[in-house]
Each structure stands twice: as structure tokens, then as C-alpha cells.
């Protein structure tokens, strides 16, 4: 955990600055509640992270069906906002359908969506290289992808880091060498540094991007939490799906990560809930890290 937090802190200069979403909030003293359901009367909508809120690994969190039903009963609007870019958000939605969760496709937004929205602003002459190997390549004419066996490191004029499941030291060395030679920009569609897995943490694109920055000084653009574009996109889709307006200080992001979920929500003018029972802080330490990093949620909840 400490290593993951250290990488996030090293990336803080590239992250947005938090702000207080509620003028009356005692933001440096988060309110602790036993269950997330207790805050439902305080909000009109929730953005739910995927891992650590809806699921852990390949299984849904105990009680998620009951929580979603209670949110609906209290007329709280729901969106899923996840840092996931290896595949399209439709894959995540299909998983939720398999579990019997009552989301429709329009309610699920991933960090890949924010990158996809940016593609129209990139010249068609730029060859975009999708990395790593275990991803669905970006749908763009003339693009190249490791997943397709293309010579990405020699052909790409821009690298799009979508996932890191198949990424290793040889790939990292090749990326750093290519950028050192060609000075291509690096777009990170999943800013996560690490995710709990099998008693430890996986290295996610944010971790490898931090190493690339240190080694090459590469110019980076970020498209998932905590960066503003993904929150604005999700907010727009929230209002479109429910066909009504929402006040930002009545919308809360629920997640297990201080540096992505909580910081990003604050910077976007939303409220936030740190859920500690299932994800990054499932073994404790949330209070200490909040004070160390000075990233404050509005609420801390242990379980759903």
C-alpha cells in the first residue's frame, strides 16, 4: 500500500487540485458512517466506482443488489464511473448484467470513454499506438496495436496506454526507448497506479506512466479519474439519462482510492465517499493516509 501511495504522491503535480464541494462542509473532518446507505438522504445522485465498490475481483460485493435497490427506492440516481480502458465500457456492463445488477448500458462510463471522446481532436495523420497486448485496440483508422502484432514502438506517433495486464519490463524498456528517440506523447486512459490482487497489488498504467515520465520526461495527457474530463463526461451523461438537472454538491463519488475517486470528485465540485471495506483500505490505514496526503472525503463508510 505505501508503495502505491508513494507513486500517486509523485504524480500529484500532474493531478488537479481539490476544492471544497459544499461551502458548509467540515471537509477536513470527514463524517464516518457504518454503511453507505446512511448517506442516501444527503444526495441526489451517486457515481459508483467499479472495483472496491461494486465488485472485488470477479465477484460482486456482498450486499450490492440490496444497496442498489434501496438507492432506487430513495430516488437516488446512479452512474458507474470506473478507471478501466483495456476494453470498452460495454464489457463492464455485460459483467454487471451477468450478476443481475440493474444498470443499463448508458449508466456505465469508463475512462476509455474520455479518451475516445478526445480522438476527434487528434489529427488523422497521427498514428496512434494502442498498448498493451491484452486490450481491445482503439477504433481508429490507421492505428497500430500491440494486440494485433504491429510494430507499435517504431510506427506510432502517439502512444495510448489502455491497460497493463500483459505489460512487463521488456515492453517498458521498448516504450522508453521509443519515446527517447521520437518524443511521442503518451496518453494514459487508466491513471490507476495499482489495484489489490491476490494479497498484493498489480501494476496498472499509472505506475508504468510514472516510470516513463521519470525516464524520459514525456508529455502526458490523462483521461480517467482524478482528471476533470471523465467527471464532466459522466455528469453530462447523468443529466442526459435521467433527463433532469443536478446540483454538483448533491452528487457524490463513491470509491476506494483517495488519489483517483476522492481527489477527482473534489476537483470536479462533487462530494465524495471513501468506502474502506473492500478495496485499497480493506486492511485498514485509511485515516492515516487521509492525513498524510491531505485528501479529504466528505464521508467515510465501512460497507455498503
Question: Which role fits each region the language model picked out?
Answer:
Residues 84:
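Conserved phosphate/oxyanion-binding catalytic-loop motifs
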Residues 1-59, 65-74, 87-109, 116, ...:
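Asp-based, Mg2+/Mn2+-dependent phosphohydrolase catalytic module
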